[in-house]
Amino acid sequence: MENKKEPIFIFDLDQTTIDSTHRVGHGSLTSWVRNATRKNIMKDKLLFLSQFISILDKHGYKVIICTSRVMSKWDWEFLYSKMNIPSHVKVIHRAEGDTRQDDKYKNTRLAYLNNFIQYKNRWKVLIDDREDVRKAFSNLGRKCKAWDIPKATEKMLSEFWVRG
């Protein structure tokens, strides 16, 4: 059961909880899409922070995944079969054709956490590898903060590793 007084944790996927660098190809969006086959997606590797999605959920925290990916059926298969994401965890993902910069996209999609009364007074913690995304999220509201991977790792280990 969700503890409504505790912070809300928002996790990015690529290079934060999942290593998908083998799919980058030449670095273009076209290359990324071409490499987004089931075979390649199933080669993605889980990063250390990925385990905390389930640990935090188990301890009653609201956990959200917010990715800039356009999710394919194989991405969903990976989340549920390899990452073992609980089915009730909200996954915010990009719609086909959405070309906004990642920081603007994520801020727009996560703004409800700062506006809706049930979330407004709770701390929101975004964990993302991208500095521009973290900075934009931190500016979303006074109860919005963002952690890079080293800080998130340190916090998760000190707060939840012993309990996990």
Where are these regions (language model features)?
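Conserved Lys-Pro-Asp/Glu-containing loop-to-beta segment of HAD-superfamily phosphomonoesterases
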Residues: 7-8, 106-131, 137
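Short, solvent-exposed coil/turn linker segments
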Residues: 19, 93, 100-101, 105, ...
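Generic alpha-helical hydrophobic packing signal
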Residues: 62-66, 111, 117-120, 145-149
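Short, aromatic/basic amphipathic alpha-helical patches
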Residues: 77-85, 112-115, 135-141
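Short, surface-exposed amphipathic charged segments that create phosphate/polyanion-binding patches used
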Residues: 100-113, 158-164
